[in-house]
Amino acid sequence: MRWPLIVLAVLVIVLQYPLWLGKGGWLRVWDVDRQLQAQRETNQRLEQRNAGLEAEVRDLKSGNEAVEERARFELGLTKPDEIFVHTPRKP
């Protein structure tokens, strides 16, 4: 009576091993799901960044306002009749 119970227990353990620890087991599925979620978050951040860059490129191609704004803020350029006043920010 004891041998069939032991054989049955061993059989259950042998059948459960691939389910939990095998190549397509639950632990592997959980790990891949976690990696997939992290990749989706990265993709979302990059899509937002790309949209911002695309808008900036479109703005630079379409008119002179964006070019003028960049020249003013990044290079400190002014028009001939303007006076440039710089107010430093407190750290």
Swiss-Prot record:
Bilayer topology term: Single-pass type II membrane protein
Coiled-coil residue windows: 28-74
UniProt key word Ribosomal protein: no
Superkingdom of source: Bacteria
Pfam families (alphabetical): DivIC
Transmembrane annotation, as ranges: 4-21
Record key words, sorted: Cell cycle, Cell division, Cell inner membrane, Cell membrane, Coiled coil, Membrane, Transmembrane, Transmembrane helix
Stretches assigned to the Cytoplasmic side: 1-3
Example of a GO biological process term: FtsZ-dependent cytokinesis
Periplasmic topological domain residue ranges: 22-91
Role description: Essential cell division protein. May link together the upstream cell division proteins, which are predominantly cytoplasmic, with the downstream cell division proteins, which are predominantly periplasmic.
Family under the similarity heading: Belongs to the FtsB family.
Name listed for the protein in its UniProt record: Cell division protein FtsB
